[in-house]
C-alpha cells in the first residue's frame, strides 16, 4: 500500500479515488491479499485476480489498504468486530468490518455486499453512510455469492459525497459521482415488520419525529 501511495504521489491523477485508502470486505477477491470469505477453510486462499469492482477502484487510483471482517460466507458465524461507539453493542453484519473501519476513522471508504440487510444494517449501527444501489448496478464477478438473485454490492463512507465517489468507481459509471441538492422533501416508506415490537423507545420516538418534520 505504501509503495502504491508513493507511486501515485509521483504521477498524474488517475481517477476519482486517487490516493484514497480503501478497505475491501473479505468476500471480494484480491490478487495481492488473502481472501478467506470469513472462513478458516479459506485462510490461505490467494485469488489470481481482483474482483471486477476492486479492479475498477484500483484503476480509479484507490489504494487497497486491507481486507475487512465479514461474517462467514456473509451469513453464518460472525467475525471479531466491535462497534466503534460502544464495545458492548453489535456492529451489525455481514459487512461489519467495513462499517467499523469507516466509523472508527481507519479508512474513508470500504466496500460491502448485501443480500438482505448487510450494508444498511451495519451502516446504521456504526453511524456511517452505507449505500446499496439497485441490483446489478455493480458487477458481482469475483465476489463470493450467497444468493445470486439478491446479492448486491455497495460501499460505506462518512459522507454521501464520499460514498458517491466509491459507487461511481466500483460501477465504472463516473456520472454517479455527481451529488445534487434536494429541492423537495424526501418521502420514505416504513414497513413495520413483526420485529417492530422490539424497537426501543428511542428508535420509535426518532421515527415519529421524522415523520412530521
Question: What is the predicted role of each segment?
Answer:
Residues 33-37, 66, 147-148, 188-193:
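Short beta-strands and strand-loop turn motifs
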Amino acid at each position: 500500500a505504501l509503495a502504491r501511495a508513493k507511486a501515485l504521489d509521483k504521477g498524474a491523477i488517475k481517477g476519482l479515488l486517487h490516493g484514497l485508502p480503501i478497505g475491501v470486505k473479505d468476500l471480494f477477491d484480491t490478487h495481492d491479499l488473502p481472501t478467506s470469505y470469513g472462513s478458516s477453510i479459506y485462510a490461505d486462499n490467494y485469488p489470481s485476480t481482483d474482483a471486477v469492482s476492486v479492479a475498477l477502484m484500483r484503476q480509479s487510483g484507490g489504494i487497497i489498504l486491507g481486507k475487512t471482517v465479514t461474517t462467514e460466507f456473509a451469513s453464518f458465524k460472525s467475525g471479531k468486530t466491535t462497534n466503534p461507539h460502544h464495545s458492548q453493542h453489535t456492529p451489525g453484519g455481514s459487512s461489519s468490518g467495513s462499517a467499523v473501519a469507516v466509523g472508527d476513522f481507519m479508512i474513508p471508504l470500504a466496500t460491502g455486499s448485501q443480500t438482505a440487510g448487510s450494508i444498511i444494517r451495519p451502516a446504521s449501527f456504526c453511524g456511517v453512510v452505507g449505500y446499496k444501489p439497485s441490483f446489478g448496478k455493480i458487477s458481482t464477478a469475483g465476489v463470493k455469492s450467497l444468493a445470486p438473485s439478491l446479492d448486491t454490492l455497495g460501499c460505506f463512507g462518512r459522507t454521501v459525497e464520499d460514498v458517491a465517489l466509491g459507487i461511481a468507481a466500483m460501477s465504472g459509471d463516473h456520472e454517479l459521482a455527481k451529488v445534487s441538492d434536494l429541492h423537495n422533501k424526501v418521502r420514505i416508506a416504513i414497513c413495520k415488520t413483526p420485529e417492530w415490537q422490539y424497537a426501543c423507545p428511542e428508535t420509535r420516538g426518532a421515527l415519529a419525529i421524522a415523520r412530521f418534520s
